[in-house]
């Protein structure tokens, strides 16, 4: 019995020393952020991480290739039919009967997806003016990059809100970086009107950002041919105007068919020569790239 007490006391003392030593050695290790994650301050402390953060926002753009259970978006129209898909989505798409349900992640998961992208845009717009320039960049080049990134963030945010509108109608417009531990609800208890959401915000964002974006040639030569360019802003502006002039939205938006036609004509006048249904080029890579872009 005496030996048991001695052994127990010994191991308790050893454990106490070990715990104390761990605390002395590692400090508040368990309370620290994972080493592979950067804080907001760290991201925007240098241009390299700021650039990576900004380009990552492009990942929130979606495409029609196999997006919904391996089905193509064209199969939801009269243009095509999906021959392979899982979960019964093929049939639903082909007969135009795809609807919101617990499994319809395209509809249910889009809310979080786009608000995450919107938050990244807000974070960039909040911080980028204070990011130091890269060592190899001149002051003039840095100012150009900042202007382009801000314009791209405004475009992406407008695009994300437009995609949300197509699924949910007007949703809360968040243009600040919300504090997860702060008041998240009091300023977003009412749904904005269609005019406030689309006309006063989305269309204004698209119109204002166009001047700061790259032109199409510069975008193609930048090494990132998918970068947002001026024609993209004007094209989306025209698309939104077309929706707003429709019978469904005209009474609330105040936009007429003539205004929508003028927006489309503006795109064709300024950018129409840059695009075509068929173009020729001696470089197969360029032909394929142009077919997509």
Spell out what each predicted region is.
Residues 184-197, 249-252, 256:
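Structural transition elements
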